[in-house]
Structure formats: C-alpha cells, structure tokens
Amino acid sequence: MKKIRSVTLFIATLLLTFNVLGQVSKSNDLYERQKAFVDLKFGMFIHFNIPTYYNQDWPDPEASPMQFNPTKMDCTQWAKAAKSANMTYGCLTTKHHSGFCVWDTKSTNYNVMQSPFKRDVVKEFVTAFRKEGLKVMLYYSILDTHHKLRPNQIQPKHIAMVKQQLKELLTKYGPIEALIIDGWDAPWSRISYDDVPFEQVYKLVKSLQPNCILMDLNGAKYPSDGLYYTDIKTYEMGAGQRLSKETNQMPALACLPLQSSWFWKTDFPTTPVKDPVKLVNETLVPLNKANCNFILNVAPNREGLFDDNALAALKVIGDTYKKDNQPANFKATGAPIISKNLAKNQPANSSWSDDMNIMDFANDDDFHSSWQSNPEVKQPWYEIAFKTPQTFNTVVIFESKPNIRKYKLEYEDNNQWKTFFEGENTKRVKLHRASKMHGSKIRVTIQEADSSPSIAEFQVYNEVR
C-alpha cells in the first residue's frame, strides 16, 4: 500500500512539474516575442477602407461597396514609402468600425470583391511589404456597425463571424507578426470581453499562429502597469493616452496619425502634416528608449496612393531617424489576463466603509471608482461572496496609487477559511497566481498601509492556458 501511495504521489508531482514547466515555457516564449516586437521600433499604420471615400472616420453603416474604387492603388508605393522612413513593418485596417472587409472573405457580402475594384487589398498589401523586406501586421475591429455587432445587439452569429474572419486573415496570408484589435471593451465601444469572449478569440489566434502577438487598443480603460487582455500595452496618443517615458516597465505600442486624422480627407493634399523632425526627436526616439514601438498612420487617398506631402514627410523621417540597435529592456511580465473576471458585479462585503465609497465600487469594472475603508478601522477587510462557488487561480488587487503594503488573501471552502498569500507587496497592481482553488468567498485583510486603504478593483480569474 505504501508503495502504491509513493508511486501515485510521484506521478502526481511529475504531472504538476510538467504543467508548471509548460506554463513557464509558454510565458518565456511570449517574453521573447514581446521583446522582438518592441525591437521592431517603428512601423506604418495604414487606415484604408470605406471611410476613405467619406470625409468622416465613421461613415454611414449602409455605405455601398460601390463607393470603394481605388483605381490606382499601389501597395508597392506604400511599402517603399515605409522603407524610406526606416520603418520595419506595416499594419493594414482589414475591417474598421463600419464593417467593410478589404479582403476576399466568405463571411459577408460587404467586402471588396463586391466593389468595382474587385481586388484583395490584404493580399496585395502583404505581398508588397514582404517584397521590400518588411514585416506585416493586421488591424481588425470587433465593433461593426454594418453587421450590428454593437452594444446590446450581439448574438452568437456575430461571434461566429468574428472567428471566421480572423481564421481567414490568419490562414490565407502567411505569417502575421501581430494583430491589432480595436472597438472592444473600450469606454466608447461598450462591447465587453464577456459579450465577445476574449479568451476564445485569444486562443483561436494563438492556435492558428502561435507567434502572432495580439494587442487590443484598450488603454482607455485598463491601467498602464498590468497586462489585461493584450500581449502588449497600447496607447492611442491622439486620444490623450500617454506612456510614462520615465517609469514604463511594460512592452508597449503607441500610435498616432501623420495627418490630422486616421482616414484620408479631401484637404489632406494641401494641409501640412505633423512636423517630421519633431516626430522623430520628440516622439519616436523617446518612446523607443522607453520600450515602446511606435506606429505612425499614413492614409492613402481615394486613388489608393499616398499624397506627395506624406511621401515627403516620410523621406525626412528616414533621413532624421537612425534606428538604434539597443534591445528592449524590460523584465518578463508573465502571461496577460485573458479570462472572465469572476468578481465583477458579484455581492461584496467589507469592514466599515468611508462615507459613500462602499463595497461595490471595487468590483464594478471601473478603475476610476474605489471602495474606501473608514480611517477608524485598524485592519480593514474586503470580500467577494460569489453567488455560486467558483474555481479560480488568479487574484488582482488594483489601487489608484500604491498604498497597501502588507495583507492576507484567503478563500472560504466548506465553511473553512484557507490562506493562500500573506506578506508584503507595494505595487499598485498586486497580481497573485496560484494553484486552482474552489470557494464561495474570497477576502483580503489589510494589515499595513501608508494611509486609509482603498481598492479600485478586486478581480478574480480562472486562467486556463
């Protein structure tokens, strides 16, 4: 009997070891991919779609495919222009928020093959950029006003369409360095990662192209010092999102248009673009030093070509910018959060709260509101009481600023409290990964803090990889 127990214990230990080693290996693989992405330094965003034929970035969702007809489109011109600026890659908008697809897709008739142009723009883009020795990335919007993939309208058919479209993009056009996703769990799009399940999409992308970096432009919502639902932190500079060049410790991407907006407008040929020398010296170079890849948008006109003023600016950028060979310098971040937040909008309890800053502010999916402990409480506590018992392995405590220094985390299982962490952690984002736990409640007891504690978000996940 003892021999059987010993063998069983040995096998269980071995399986656990293999599982942990597998997770470490995947995390290390991602770390190498993140460094390789940051080391690309500088690339070209290309917003080219139905909005090009309107003077608005958000056109009529029912705009006819007949509008799209870039009779002189030359992706080789784009690629050579990118190369002249010392860029290393290009990224094309395959589908923007109005839902028009610029590739030969079987998922919808709202695509380029139904236009007078009848050419696969994605195919010509990847071919031209690779021929010039440049890597290729693709942009894809979850928000889709034409197909009614928008708040309070999402049905299973929409999720199936997203998966079909991503499968086409990741199987028909060779290796894709990175996929930039937009219009998803942002304050303005209001499509959550529950509405269109992020974990399913993430795993689909990685199953089709394991080396493809997946980024979501979710910087308007999620904090800068945690990887939430993205392999790379993203910053839309035109929307006021700013990376701290002094303190950033995350692999990052920042984007900005060369012209006044993302898609081409009729005044672009005669309107000055951003100062190319300033772009290099005040934006590109400082961002690169802060572990941030910079992607500059250049909008083709209605003929499918870059305007002369844009071409001239890119040449000046290339003459000014000399890509350094300094490798990315950030520590491994670990895998990003990709699963559903089990604590969101669940019943919450706490010790005495301060004024109106009560318990539900810490699990309302809003990083700008907080539960605040009353200053009279010496060791305040906060807990999530799940409506039904949950299995989980990851807990995140987010503070608006670092304050809590020492605390204990425990969960209730069969009316017994079990501690899984007790100690110090002074970071603003306190991330805890552990073996699987199962319980009806999870609680943090705060033992030391610099001032009266507050928690902006208390999050619980079951991360399966």
Model-predicted segments: where are they?
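Bacterial N-terminal signal peptides that target proteins for export
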Residues: 1-8
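Cleavable N-terminal signal peptides
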Residues: 9-10, 20
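Short clusters of hydrophobic/aromatic residues that line enzyme substrate/ligand-binding pockets
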Residues: 103, 254, 362, 371-372
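Aromatic, loop-rich ligand-recognition surfaces of beta-strand-rich domains
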Residues: 328-334, 363-465
